[in-house]
Swiss-Prot record:
SUPFAM superfamilies: EGF/Laminin, Integrin beta tail domain, Integrin domains, Plexin repeat, vWA-like. This is Integrin beta-6. The gene is ITGB6. Residues 456-491, 492-538, 539-575, 576-615 form the I-EGF domain. The keyword Phosphoprotein does not apply.
Length: 788
């Protein structure tokens, strides 16, 4: 017993108690109500554990209850647990008796769950070797499948031969389908009804829905004989009644011959789509498919013209319920359509069928090998409101979260699945859930039972003396009062109560409207927001102001509606820090000397100042230059400043200090050029009161006075020298010009040559002129003749 208590002790300490007071705030007054709050809550049934008015304090986390003084034996805290009822080991190798095969473990268990908690269990699946196989060949016998029918006449022998390599226990059967024999799916003239192929012309069977022709048998020759006797039929529209046939083949277990301990393969062969659901309303058929077997004495579907086609959902339910694995062998045009169907139907596969079904044997073998390489779980039963999640642990321990399927498994390998189950509440009683591998008959049956009651509820003291003269029943540490009585111990009568003592003032509501008056004392209500307290329930710790959504800015405690700030914080919202670290500028001054530090932020007071530490101020004077008048006056006074210097320093807001003991790290170094061209250096610092102090004033690099005589002498000599140089240059230019002119003259004189002819300047004394009015001789003769 001691070891068990020790184990429970550590279990309680490890439970979730991260929400302080979260259980107590819900105000649970009974053990059952406490458990419904959450899996982290427990109830203390110890007598006199809390103040009579604090019944809800009994509901808390286990760790908090232990800290309050509740003994471990009185803590009611049912935990989720798994109780395995049946767990046979998985079968290994070949089994002589198929009934002894175990392919899933465990097989039966009870799962007790606290609402809000979860429990994880491991499920293992191993497909056994040489597992029996039942294969039912369901063929479309519409006219377009004529060549396919001829191809499979020897399929039975070939299929049995190939399957014998995979299993020693193989059976096969045969069935066929066409379409519902009603208009508009077929022609209704007497000739067309008797022979739907009369227009070809060709003799074929009348249209039929589904025929079960050969039950499952291990006689392959019998299968061949049956197939050879089959004839085609015909219908009008392209979709066929294949889903009607699948439904009957799945649910007519006895007539088909499905065994309990075998792999059920249904090979569906067609070259067309299938009708489903309400397609039959075109023929006036409105009765929903009931999902039951309706094969008559001739093994034909008797309700083909009465019931609708099954819906996809109905088909999935019946196929899964009867562990049937569908293999859709369809032509190229139909593959995409049936792949969509296969995605909805667990365990279904799709294979490409050649036009004449020439590859049907290889298609079946490949589909069988694919199905045997996959392990997939499916969940059946009452799962409404139940939360289940799966994690597949496949080859080499590889984890696949949120998956319940393992691929590329070899027969004999084990696939594990971690199944996590939880329930949200206690609204429903026990549920029955089944987890099984797709296509296999082995199942894991789970009874999910909610843990919503306490053991102490089974022990009730009616009219107990612990409840004030037997005025109530004592259960789980508290009293449930009889009618007419109330109070923690049923000590108060309802007809004698007065609420005056529970009012702060006569015009105030009882217990401030936030509590109940029991026997003249306020029992404050519990609130999910915090604690309500005070003699009149007038105080709480959650009605204070908030900053950025946080109570008292998360920097203080709410006491009776007012924020009490913690150290380092102030203000109504406790959002104002008293620290000035964030206000110190790079030069070490508070807000650069241009503002005040308010709530950890600089409030700039100088006009034009801005920035986090008021460091930017285009209109502000230079902090060094603004002290110039004080500094220069101090230097000119040779260390003995007068009243004029004191006024200038006071106006500049500085104090001159000769002390050498000061912090140079927080000081600002300044350099100014004085009126005498000297370099003035000094340090500026700020004391604790924010006053500016100047240290270490000094002058250096002062220029010497100029030598006037030497400057004048130098200037005079320079002027004289410049004049001489200019005169020399002028003389050189004139000489050069004269030389050039003389040379030119000499050159022209040497070229002159005087001739001995007439003087070109001489003019003769006689001049000859031509009379422009003179006429020629002919003209003169004419004139003379005229005169004569």
């Amino acid at each position: 017993m001691g070891i068990e208590l020790l184990c429970f002790f550590f279990l309680f300490l490890g439970r979730d108690d991260h929400v302080r007071g979260g259980c107590a705030m819900e105000g649970a007054e009974t053990c059952g109500d406490c458990l419904l709050i959450g899996p982290q809550c427990a109830w203390c049934s110890q007598e006199n554990f809390t103040h009579p008015s604090g019944v809800s304090e009994r509901c808390d986390t286990p760790a908090n209850l232990l800290a309050k003084g509740c003994q471990l034996t009185f803590i009611e805290n049912p935990v989720s647990q798994v109780e395995i009822l049946k767990n046979k080991p998985l079968s290994i190798g070949r089994q002589k008796n198929s009934s002894d095969i175990v392919q899933i473990a465990p097989q039966n268990l009870i799962l007790k769950l606290r609402p809000g908690s979860e429990q994880t269990l491991q499920v293992q699946v191993r497909q056994t070797e040489d597992y029996p196989v039942d294969l039912y060949y369901l063929m479309d016998l519409s006219a377009s499948m004529d060549d396919d029918l001829n191809t499979i006449k020897e399929l039975g022998s070939l299929l049995s031969k190939e399957m014998s390599k995979l299993t020693s226990n193989f059976r096969l059967g045969f069935g066929s389908f066409v379409e519902k024999p009603v208009s508009p799916f077929m022609k209704t003239t007497p000739e067309e009804i008797a022979n739907p192929c009369s227009s070809i012309p060709y003799i074929c069977l009348p249209t039929f829905g589904f025929k079960h022709i050969l039950p499952l048998t291990n006689d392959a020759e019998r299968f061949n004989e049956i197939v050879k006797k089959q004839k085609i039929s015909a219908n009008i529209d392209t979709p066929e009644g294949g889903f009607d046939a699948i439904m009957q083949a799945a649910v007519c277990k006895e007539k088909i011959g499905w065994r309990n301990d075998s792999l059920h393969l249904l090979v569906f062969v067609s070259d067309a789509d299938s009708h489903f659901g309400m397609d039959s309303k075109l023929a006036g058929i409105v009765i929903p498919n009931d999902g039951l077997c309706h094969l008559d004495s001739k093994n034909e579907y008797s309700m083909s013209t009465v019931m609708e086609y099954p819906t996809i959902g109905q088909l999935i339910d019946k196929v899964v319920q009867n562990n049937v694995l569908l293999i859709f062998a369809v032509t190229q045009e139909q593959v995409p359509l049936y792949e969509n169907y296969a995605k909805l139907i667990p365990g279904a596969t799709v294979g490409l069928l050649h036009k004449d079904s020439g590859n049907i044997l290889q298609l079946i073998i490949s589909a069988y090998e694919e199905l045997r390489s996959e392990v997939e779980l499916e969940v059946l039963g009452d799962t409404e409101g139940l939360n289940l999640s799966f994690t597949a642990v496949c080859n080499n321990g590889t984890l696949f979260p949120h998956q319940k399927k393992c691929l590329h498994m070899k027969v004999g390998e084990t696939a594990s699945f971690n199944v996590t189950v939880s329930i949200p509440n206690c609204e429903r009683k026990s549920r029955h859930v089944i987890i099984k591998p797709v296509g296999l008959g082995d199942t894991l049956e789970i009874l999910v039972s909610p843990e919503c009651s306490c053991d102490c509820q089974k022990e009730v003291e009616v009219n107990s003396s612990k409840c004030h003269n037997g005025n109530g029943s004592y259960q789980c540490g508290v009293c449930a009062c009889n009618p007419g009585h109330m109070g923690p111990h049923c000590e108060c009568g309802e007809d004698t109560l007065s609420t005056d003592s529970c009012k702060e003032t006569p015009d105030h509501p009882s217990c401030s409207g936030r509590g109940d008056c029991y026997c003249g004392q306020c029992i404050c209500h519990l609130s999910p927001y915090g604690n309500i307290y005070g003699p009149y329930c007038q105080c709480d710790n959650f009605s204070c102001v908030r900053h950025k959504g946080l109570l008292c800015g998360d920097n203080g405690d709410c006491e009776c509606g007012e924020c009490v700030c913690r150290s380092g914080w102030t203000g109504e919202y406790c959002n104002c820090t008293t620290s000035t670290d964030t206000c110190i500028s790079e030069d070490g001054t508070l807000c650069s000397g241009r503002g005040d530090c308010v709530c950890g932020k600089c409030v700039c007071t100088n006009p034009g100042a801005s920035g986090p530490t008021c460091e930017r101020c285009p209109t502000c004077s230079d902090p060094c230059n603004s002290k110039r008048s004080c500094i220069e006056c101090h230097l000119s006074a040779d260390g003995q400043p007068g009243e004029e210097c004191v006024d200038k320093c006071k106006l500049a807001g500085v104090t001159i200090s000769k002390e050498a003991d000061f912090s140079k790290d927080s000081s600002v170094s300044c350099s100014l050029q004085g009126e005498n061209e000297c370099l003035i250096t000094f340090l500026i610092s700020t004391d604790n009161e924010g006053k500016t102090i100047i240290h270490n004033i000094s002058e250096k690099d002062c220029p010497k006075p100029p030598n006037i005589p030497m400057i004048m002498l130098g200037v005079s000599l320079a002027i004289l020298l410049i004049g001489v140089v200019l005169l020399c240059i002028w003389k050189l230019l004139v000489s050069f010009h004269d030389r050039k002119e003389v040379a030119k003259f000499e050159a022209e004189r040497s070229k002159a040559k005087w001739q001995t002819g007439t003087n070109p300047l001489y003019r003769g004394s006689t001049s000859t002129f031509k009379n422009v009015t003179y006429k020629h001789r002919d003209k003169l003769k004419t004139d003379l003749s005229t005169d004569g």
